[in-house]
Amino acid sequence: MNKTEFLLKLKLQKGIGYVKLLTIARQLDEGNTIKLADLQELDLSQELSDACIRVFRDLELDHLVKQIYRQCEVVGFFDEVYPQKLRQIYRPPLILFAKGDTSLLSKETITIVGSRYPTNYSEKVINRMVPNLVRKNIAVASGLAKGVDSLAHQAALRNQGKTIAVIGNGLNHFYPRQNFDLQSEIVQKGLLISEYLPDTPPRPFRFPERNRILAGLSQGVIITEAKDKSGSLITANLAMQENRDVYAVPGPITNQLSAGPNQLIEDGAIPIIDFKFDEGKI
């Protein structure tokens, strides 16, 4: 059995969350496959040993896995296509579910995030910024939320660029509903990924969890507009923790949506003062 299927069957079991899955994954060797006999070499609790054995013996798990593979691609931590940058982050996703062009996982990428309720300042900045990224063959990643996320994805597609959407729910859900057409277009022309099983519904706590993937997947993160308590700042701070470049679009101090980017600049983020994007900067 390949290790991706092994991890997926573990993930499907009740009571096996991220920490337990990581405990098992850390003990696997560097090969691509695992056999039932290999389990004897693992130093696991009885609970985790039983879960590993069920992977090989539970026919219901086989059925569930086949259903998932009919719906999407599954990329595991041990697969060659798994992005190297994500391997380096704290709490890397061990399984990614994907629809679209998974070769984009190895492409140079910049994440753009910001307010769900931006002013036209964000729209103007993104519409000037993204064509330059596309010309440099850089993919644009974002979270498919309304507002800045949607503007970033749309600008990439409009300029015949590549875009990656990292969502905080399963791939079978369209959230927000207003982005149904955009999500469908990203599947056709870009890449849609999630660490959640395909039928997982959107829940508020999942979006901050998703942000670590947005931060880790890219070389850098750009914040256009965000309030000082915005979730976009979570992504920016995660990027800083992972030694990624953080860029912020400065704005007037009278605009509360510029409070987040301005604070990031004060904390050491690189201010975006033009749209040249020299190779040494991005």
Functional labels for PLM-detected ranges:
Residues M1-K124:
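Short, positively charged patches
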Residues F77-I282:
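Glycine-biased, small-residue-rich flexible motifs in mid-sequence functional cores and linkers
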